[in-house]
Amino acid sequence: MALHDTPSARKVTTTPDGPARLYVCGITPYDATHLGHASTYVAFDLLNRAWRNAGHDVTYVQNVTDVDDPLLERAAKVHVDWVELAERETELFRQDMAALRVIPPDHYVGAVESIPLVIELIGRLETAGAIYRVEDDLYFSVTADPAFGAESGWDRERMLEIYPERGGDPDRPGKKDPLDCVVWRGRREGEPSWESPWGPGRPGWHVECTAIAQRHLGGAFDVQGGGSDLVFPHHEMCAGHAQVAVPGTPFAQVYSHGGMVGYDGEKMSKSRGNLVFVSALRNSDVDPMAIRLALLRHHFRSDWEWTDDQLWVAVDDIARWRKALSLGAGAPAAPVIDEVLAALADDLDAPRATAAIDRWVAATLGTAGLADTTDPDAAARLLAALDAALGLALWLS
């Protein structure tokens, strides 16, 4: 399995030693799952499946940021309890992922339940001299990590430009370095808080993922995944925390990042409101397999724009594939399956994999000539391969 590694900017081969270990950053559950989310989780589901199909056991961990500023702000705005909102949207997310046939993580871990882990990690960082206080908040000093910047490959100027757009506070008085990040936010009026050795408060965003990953996966796990908007500051900060807490051990071996999905000319995001929700499509009786196929038509690392036409093309494609699969016999399946597996092993190239299926369907239906039905078991073999490798369940009732 070769994946493009963000820090090295090249494809590297993942070589799991024992169970493959995967961490993908999860949602902040204050709204429904949109197609940008779905694209990321479908992509890393391909990795999970590829490892499993290659015979590896897989330990897959995903967090849910079930306490954070956006969640608290949304709960206040719509006049619901923040816990109720988080639980409702988390359950909807799980339903959406199940409909898209994303294999659930082995450990799906909330920030709130992980607060003891976060406190323990902050204590280790404090012992290492990497923590300081600004009023009631605790900050991580990025200079404590000699390798800071290696994960993103960004220079300081670019970091400072982007940091305030992604939750950072570079201009706060009292900070030692503008890029330092909060690891413990002291109690604010009207906000939930938990006791700690440094006073009541709640975790910072980055440190929760570090604590969860270290507890459930250990150090130097195989792949850290997420969207490209997490390269900096999130994954850079997570790596910094981990590498100061456990010197000499990298946080992850490979960092793999998916592209951004746009809609109406801009990145799909909750703040802009230009969202297409998986649940809304499902409630409109759209076949979830068509949604998944529409996502798979794009390479996961590419930025791309969603259009409704793509969905309807996928609906038609699924119908055409099912028609070919209903025949039983078809064009030889073995070379098609080999091509699908080879494509996915090459940086999760789902467009190449689905194109191989298109060619088999065309040959089987005789779209461009005589129908090829020389393989009597083609449909059964391809149905199983589509399910196992691409997560497309096209079994005929």
From Swiss-Prot:
Segments carrying motif 'HIGH' region: 27-37
Q: How are cofactors bound according to the entry's free-text note?
A: Binds 1 zinc ion per subunit.
Reading the lineage from the top rank, the first entry is Bacteria
Give the GO cellular component terms, alphabetically.
Answer: cytosol
Q: Could you tell me which Gene3D superfamilies the record lists for this protein?
A: Anticodon-binding domain of a subclass of class I aminoacyl-tRNA synthetases, HUPs
Q: Where is this motif: 'ERGGDP' region?
A: 165-170
Molecular function (GO) terms for this protein are: ATP binding; cysteine-glucosaminylinositol ligase activity; cysteine-tRNA ligase activity; zinc ion binding
**EC primary class:** ligase
Q: Supply the InterPro entries for this chain.
A: Cys-tRNA/MSH_ligase, Mycothiol_ligase_MshC, Rossmann-like_a/b/a_fold, tRNA-synt_1_cat_dom
* Biological-process GO terms, alphabetical: cysteinyl-tRNA aminoacylation; mycothiol biosynthetic process
**Cofactors per UniProt?**
Zn(2+)
- Spell out the reaction equation it catalyses: 1D-myo-inositol 2-amino-2-deoxy-alpha-D-glucopyranoside + L-cysteine + ATP = 1D-myo-inositol 2-(L-cysteinylamino)-2-deoxy-alpha-D-glucopyranoside + AMP + diphosphate + H(+)
Q: Where is this motif: 'KMSKS' region?
A: 267-271
Give the family from UniProt: Belongs to the class-I aminoacyl-tRNA synthetase family. MshC subfamily.
Per the entry, what this protein does is: Catalyzes the ATP-dependent condensation of GlcN-Ins and L-cysteine to form L-Cys-GlcN-Ins.
UniProt subunit comment: Monomer.
Which named protein is this?
L-cysteine:1D-myo-inositol 2-amino-2-deoxy-alpha-D-glucopyranoside ligase
**Gene name, please?**
mshC
